[in-house]
């Protein structure tokens, strides 16, 4: 290859150096390293060429007078600064000339040794040769690159193909080694007619301003770079150099390196950069808890149809007729709110946002996504004022809805996706597929207050007119991952945590990613790929197949910890503004989270992020990786002998045993041997007795006993923190105020409420389902150790309820269920409730529990409530059915998602599942009347027994709930308007007698309530109604032995000896009367009050032989026992002495011989008076006087009878 060709490549490389901004006017700048740190301050790294090195340049070269340099293989000579410092590439002409005469660039060959190694590390080493190199107009000076000396850490061998002039090789010392980044220019994320607008235009004419050609607001597409780290397959790098500095990230295995300038000037001269690392913790257990990602990421589903995330992983998908295309393009509009523009400045905000979008573009280029998805930025809008019809506030859902409506009005007018659209952007801007709002506003999804949410988007909203919207909060370079994550949601990709088969990984759509902590890799999970393909096969993705043609070239292209440069106060000012300072009250936990106090506010605030590594925590210590560690590094040493295994950390249940080793000869400062210093193993003990508190709770209670406040003893309970599973957080009972009491729980403590992993020395040690520490054996979602997940099936569904109040049954989870998870789709003023067959429950009987673990249906159920959001989970298996209910308080749109697994094999016939029986529970059926009409009264709820069966609720007899604890009625104040006057009474005093009847009293006064609520005494005549009683009767019930006897009954006989009875009962409330003192219930008696009775004789014969006659009998009053006559019988009880009798009719033939005329009878019969005076009156009335026999016995009465007859005839 001739000198001319080499010179051409050198010129291209030199131009690139200038564009990257690695030039300075004689300013000393470079890398500064400290061996014990993994954080770097980068002024500019060295640039390499990828092609083969000139063998002749490895040992020296010829002098080039034109360049003012002499060829050589040595160092810089008397360069000032650190031996690892990198000088500016370009110098002023005067300095260049001086240096060319007095200071040769390369002197004598380097001497071997450490000095040689350090000097080589700081050289710029692109390949080149001697010759003149002219920079474009405006460059400070011409420059020729030096030849790279031979060294072990030289770049890899040359590639066979001819390299492109747009390629650069960037060397960055990090992670205790040199990283070589092969970068190519890549501005494909900018659309052909990309424009930057400021709304309104700054200045006297406040209209929309589009940047003119050549304006500083328009980006140069050549300052965006994409590439990889050589010798590291799967790595990714994305950078921007638009402002003269270097900004972007490197992903290398499990490490993330972020690079950005220390300030926002991004000047052309060299200046410090911040390079910091975020690494995924290999010891952190990734759980299925979706509360974490829901806390930081808001996903709004369709209001009219179920969310697409509720899709079983193993089901057979519907085969769509749409075939996947090879490439999809997302035409995007990006809007920066006024707070964002004001915070960064218009120019810096533009550079920062475009750098972020370049990173987002590269995240979607990852091969794990399965299809090529290109981000095309059509327009960047910088808002200096908030439009009148756009809401920007704390309420995230409201802001998302407002932004979608606003962007539709501004950018949504189009005729057809194939046609060009005519708007204020230009004449041929393509249709908008997505709109992104970047804000500095701290928002929350469902409430109007700040919280930790950093992104929100509509699920499956892309291409939709009013749902293709994303809002992301500015959180530094992590903003790129937030936007990529939320754009994934907008394209129908659910959280990995929502898929059981993908919940254990850390990919872009996992819950951990959105927080910007514990980053995994930049790949997309298998579930994300399937969700995206499902969306792309649907009609909803049709807009992604049409794009504006891309006309831009599509060419691929520390010495100090940051906490040493920024104090805790300065870090708080970066997060919360210039009035913020570090909260001194939280000094003891500074490394776990940076707490700041803003002037004028009473409480400290935090964003849950730890301070920068290097921040002072204690004397002689600094924060590093979230822990307060010593500044002086410990020396390495040789391995020593292991100690015997220690005793088990627990006396019951599972614990850990450990052994240690020390390295001889290094004293107390020895830290680690070659290999682990401490080893652990699981030790098993008998199960802990029932009723003992959990191990974490016991540690919290033990702490409270050690405090100097006895009143707080036994008042602490453990609170589990998912971010620090092996730290001891405790909270007062009944309050949600967790306090970090210890950075390490005791060895043997479980890492969480579920799982087998155990904490040892403050770290979560993995344990397999086979009970072995370090084992990789895991249960599948069916609960089978090392199973294949095919022995069960997943049951999932949604519950939506819009009206009603009280308890509503959602479903009955059958016995044998595992992996139970119930999650509210959004926070609501309602409560989840569970009840099993043994009446154990959570949130039943109108009693709301705090977050914690509960034993129901033979398993441990974990109830989590954060604000208004709730979640219930259980590992299972359940032994009895579980009733899932919702306690609704008011009409609202309420929704929740549930899922669990059940065995695939059907149950045996004798174990066939039966329809669960009805569920009875006490409920508050309504409110009673107020007990006062004014002045403040109370109304109570009416507690009734409720039957729940097949989601139907009905009121039943209270006897059905007799075995349940009846809740106290709820009390609500009512009629609180003041009264003019009213009677006020004190409580009744205790009864004057503790046993038996007594009296009790109270004070009664007439009072008047003033406007300020004060009560004063008034005249009794001013109060309405009679004065309430001041004394009342009472009966003491505290009697040790009180028998109460009833009245004796009458004697069982009325004449003679008999028995009488009475009732006897114990009146003691506790029924503890002494039997020996029990009165008699029966006794003998005598009664002679009814000894005289009427005695009757036999009836006589009938008085006649024919016709009507009479019969009589003797009646006498006689004594029952003695037989004596008396007159003590009751006349009302005397029986009848006579009765009529009837014989055959008399012969009507008259015998004159037998007829005696009454007159003759009266004349011939000497009447001596009536013989039967009692009966004669009856004989006369019965017309029997004509019978001589009766006449003779009653002659006197019959004579008068005949006399009257004769008178009547005469």
UniProtKB/Swiss-Prot annotation:
InterPro entries reported in the protein's UniProt record: ADAM_Cys-rich, ADAMTS/ADAMTS-like, ADAMTS17/19_C, ADAMTS_ADAMTS-like, ADAMTS_CR_2, ADAMTS_spacer1, MetalloPept_cat_dom_sf, Peptidase_M12B
Annotated signal peptide: 1-30
Gene Ontology molecular function terms on file: metal ion binding; metalloendopeptidase activity
Cofactor(s), names only, from the UniProt record: Zn(2+)
A GO biological-process term: collagen fibril organization
SUPFAM superfamilies from the UniProt entry: Metalloproteases ('zincins'), catalytic domain, TSP-1 type 1 repeat
Stretches the record annotates as Spacer: 794-917
Region (Disordered) residue spans: 55-166
Residue ranges occupied by any Peptidase M12B domain in the UniProt entry: 328-548
Modification after translation: The precursor is cleaved by a furin endopeptidase.
Pfam family, one: Pep_M12B_propep
Bias (Gly residues) ranges: 69-78
Bias (Basic and acidic residues) ranges: 84-98
Positions glycosylated per UniProt: 54, 263, 800, 910, 931, 952, 1012
Name the UniProt record assigns to this protein: A disintegrin and metalloproteinase with thrombospondin motifs 19
Organism whose genome encodes this protein: Mus musculus (Mouse)
Lineage: Eukaryota, Metazoa, Chordata, Craniata, Vertebrata
